[in-house]
Amino acid sequence: MSRGRGAASGTKYRMTLGLPVQAIMNCADNSGAKNLYIVSVFGTGARLNRLPAASCGDMVLATVKKGKPDLRKKIMPAIVVRQRKAWRRKDGVYLYFEDNAGVIVNPKGEMKGSAITGPVAKECADLWPRIASNAGTVV
């Protein structure tokens, strides 16, 4: 059910993994980064020839490809808040967003920015309280 993570609270059900390593997602906070490039995914096992992939609520290691020069060329943790790939919730609803997006955090799960643009998945908000408090809308 749950995959290993830092300061996340509660359990996370299995979701369709929509963001493999090397995916680029928008940065949904006001930290100054425009997009994030996924380098690795926390808590994934290994299988020959399978790329580690993330879904909403997963912590990833990412780099900034476009944004403030002081953020670029560093590897930092980020949390995926939206994904384009549809997934099924336990109540039978299929859900997807119009973009892939994440927010930059520290290893404890505290956000670098102070606001999130756009909606945040409920799976992510349930897991990360600091993200839930900064989210405008939770879907």
Curated annotation (Swiss-Prot):
GO terms for cellular component: cytosolic large ribosomal subunit; nucleus; preribosome. GO terms for molecular function: large ribosomal subunit rRNA binding; structural constituent of ribosome. It is found in: Cytoplasm; Nucleus. Transmembrane segments: none annotated. Pfam families: Ribosomal_L14 (PF00238). Keywords: Cytoplasm, Nucleus, Ribonucleoprotein, Ribosomal protein. One of its GO terms (biological process) is cytoplasmic translation. SUPFAM superfamilies: Ribosomal protein L14. Its main location: cytoplasm. Component of the large ribosomal subunit (LSU). Mature yeast ribosomes consist of a small (40S) and a large (60S) subunit. The 40S small subunit contains 1 molecule of ribosomal RNA (18S rRNA) and at least 33 different proteins. The large 60S subunit contains 3 rRNA molecules (25S, 5.8S and 5S rRNA) and at least 46 different proteins. HAMAP family: Ribosomal_uL14 (MF_01367). Component of the ribosome, a large ribonucleoprotein complex responsible for the synthesis of proteins in the cell. The small ribosomal subunit (SSU) binds messenger RNAs (mRNAs) and translates the encoded message by selecting cognate aminoacyl-transfer RNA (tRNA) molecules. The large subunit (LSU) contains the ribosomal catalytic site termed the peptidyl transferase center (PTC), which catalyzes the formation of peptide bonds, thereby polymerizing the amino acids delivered by tRNAs into a polypeptide chain. Belongs to the universal ribosomal protein uL14 family. There are 2 genes for uL14 in S.pombe. PANTHER family: 50S/60S RIBOSOMAL PROTEIN L14/L23, LARGE RIBOSOMAL SUBUNIT PROTEIN UL14. This is Large ribosomal subunit protein uL14A.
